[in-house]
Amino acid sequence: MRPATLALALAALAGCQSIPSDAPRATARLEPTRNNKASGTVNFYQIGSKVRVVANVSGLTPNREHGFHVHEAGDCSSGDGMSTKGHFNPLAKPHAHYSSSDRHAGDMPALKADASGNAKLEIDLDVITVTPGPTSVVGRGLIVHADPDDYKTQPTGNAGARLACAVIGRG
């Protein structure tokens, strides 16, 4: 094997940190809001100071990005997802791109639906936790939006209607 190929393979493996079996975790089962079809499962795993978010969502608009956020209230009773209130923001930060250190705790990457309307996402985030504390996502709402997040419009990113809703539970 050529040294450059070996180096690339080793770098790729180094980035694949496995999830410890005893890692604190939470889970959310997304259900469609009124007149929508989106549904799926999202798992949250505490790995050190970061949380790995693993999402599998179906029933989305094909070949489109969909805003994806943790919301303040763990309440999907309204039928349209509005009962989850605004983005989870315990540190009183502005809405921003998920890679910014100055953002809502609930700001996450957009879900990118494939040609069949399915989206998968796996990312490590450093602002939220699964363990108890002010930035814990447990008991919060989780929303998939109809439109992409522009990562700048305050306070929501102009992500549109709420297609699916879940309450994040310890899991």
Enumerate the predicted regions with their spans.
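Bacterial N-terminal signal peptides that target proteins for export
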Residues: 1-6
